[in-house]
Amino acid sequence: MRQLHEAFPHRDPTKLGENEVLDFLISLRQQRKLKDSTVNQAVCALRAFYRDHLGRKWKGWSQIKIRRDEQLPNVLSRDEVARFLGAVRQGRFLAVFTLMYHCGLRLSEVVSLKPGHIDASRGVVRIIGSKGGKDREIPISKALIERLRAFWKLHRNPEWLFPSPGRGWKSAGATLPDALRRSTKPMSDSSVQAAMRATVVALGWDLRHGRRPVTCHTLRHCFATHLLDAGVSICLVSQYLGHSSLKPTLVYLHLTEASEAKAREVLANFPGL
């Protein structure tokens, strides 16, 4: 209402006509360049005032449809991904981040992995009961399988691929491998996010240095974008991401058709191994 008063400083808002109010709303987007979310708030406020409070049965409200802001995901180049992975300080988090990037996994998916979810004979990672309750399989390179096998052999936890050492393991006098081996809980989301933030800050990529946020989910965006840039089918990429339709995958788009063999070849050449 404040902005409406500024646009019509000498008019009673209750005396404004339909066209005047609708033209004002359109000007917020086209002339003032306000964000779509801000314009939508103004639409809702004025609709409540004129339609619900004053009872104005204007037909023009149906014409005001402001699309939500569509922000493209933050994507690192391959070189930047390699720099990021090279800056991770602890081996267990390096294994997590490498797997997230190479397989496009959500944070919740990677920390929930069990050793048996890595099918070395078929070269796939099985994601069980992911978002939407769907299972899926994602190809994984032999080099990454060997790296994960070597990491697991350091702790040999029978239940979790990435177990949590638990709080106070250092003060208890345990070694990290022993703490991981005895753990009954998976690595926590917060510990992975903390390792991500520490690495981002160490690289100077945090918000204080003018970059958009780099988060765990950024690695999933990189996975999708780098596959599409290499010509892998959007249908395969959507399948690997676990999307229920192609629509959410289209945000990454620019692609040509390629076979799963091409996808495996591209994945084998991802940096970090």
What residues fall within each predicted segment?
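Conserved catalytic core of the tyrosine transesterase superfamily
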Residues: 1-273
